[in-house]
Amino acid sequence: MIIFKNGKVLKKGRLVEKDILIDGKKIVLIAENIENENAKVIDLQGKFIAPGFIDVHVHWREPGFEYKENIYHASRAAARGGFTTAMPMPNLDPVPDCYENLKLQLDIIERDSVIRAIPFGAITKGELGKDYAEFEELAPHVFAFSDDGRGVQDANMMFESMQVAAKLNKAIVAHCEDNSLIRGGCMHCGCRSRELNLPGIPSVCESVQIARDVLLAEAAGCHYHVCHVSTKESVRVVREAKKAGIKVTCEVCPHHLISDEMDIPEDNGMWKMNPPLRSEEDRKALIAGVLDGTIDVIATDHAPHAEHEKNLTMTKAAFGIVGSETAFSQLYTKFVKPGVFSLQLLVDLMTKKVAETFDLPYGKLEEGSFADLVVIDLEKNIKIDPEKFLSKGRNTPYVGEEIYGIPVLTLCEGRVAYKDEEQFANIDL
């Protein structure tokens, strides 16, 4: 048994001091002063304790692309960022489009992951958009179905996939992008792309597919979840669909809340991501969507790449940035410290609301819940240094940025998944 003493937890939006008693995989007691002679006591000295974060959008790259990232490193990077549950996307080799392929990934997760990982199954075989994946045999073992990394272009294929997913009580999770509108773009089609003379990706290529899919989801009776919304039009479509009673939810990534196209200083592949950084007007619409509840959850879209794939110009570099290790801290620094978001809202968007959106038994800090928790030093600040990342991916454009609110200890089902060696070097749980 373990007692965390002198920690602070959120209660009705306020930080209050509580002790937490953990026995095995579960939290058994939360109270003001817990004494138990059989328990190991850890003094948190006023640090903040939150439920372990849940990330429904990560790219762990294994099997197939281990030169970019692997499950061993990705799970430890996630734990360092405070995440105790993650959902790896299916753009792998082999693609998890049948149980035989999925089993390869599940076995590696069992062997190498320090946190809970629930993978996606693909919608189509090989994510090629031509033949359906084996939904029925995948369903008991996957979080949801997605062809993330590309949009499902055929409306009938998406509609029939939604119908099957609904019968299996699974969500369809979509990367929304109409290929006919991309036209080889590498950044947002806007002021900055014109200044840099680079091909742009129009906002409508995202929002038009969301508009199509919410109507298909309504007809199919399916839970439809939109990945990484990035435009004001996308927020508007989701907001109106929710008002119409359609079961649609969506996520936003930290980088789309923090930055816009004008933050891109030069033609540098580290700033290339999909969706791209949009306009300031889009960024403000995303923030408004978070505040009014249109946007349900925050997800990182952690997308590691090898150095040779990112140290290129925008037209040649791979899409994607890493985010697992810095997501909470960047958002805390940018939005909670200035008072734009409450600490309660930010934590809920990464825990409680994720669990509610997908009916998961995680994301709670209460008696009887899993001992998934993260201890955060809200006063500690560091500068982002990719050389210190636990992820194999170093591809972030935020090098040198000062961030506050640093996770220092992460437990998943009562086991240490990450600890700050400076603060907890002598703790062996």
Residue ranges and their predicted role:
Residues 56-69, 92, 118-130, 149, ...:
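Active-site mouth loops of central-metabolism enzymes
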Residues 1-51:
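Histidine-rich, glycine-flanked metal-binding segment
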Residues 132-298:
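Histidine/acidic residue-rich metal-binding segments in metalloenzymes
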Residues 195-223, 270, 291-292, 296-298, ...:
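His/Asp/Glu-enriched, well-ordered alpha-helical/loop segment
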Residues 99-116, 164-174, 326, 330:
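Alpha-helix-loop-beta-strand connector modules within alpha/beta enzyme cores
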Residues 7, 25, 46, 57, ...:
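Divalent metal-coordination and catalytic microenvironments
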Residues 45-112:
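Metal-associated gating/positioning segment near the N- to mid-region
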Residues 7, 313-316, 370-429:
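C-terminal cap of metal-dependent C-N hydrolases
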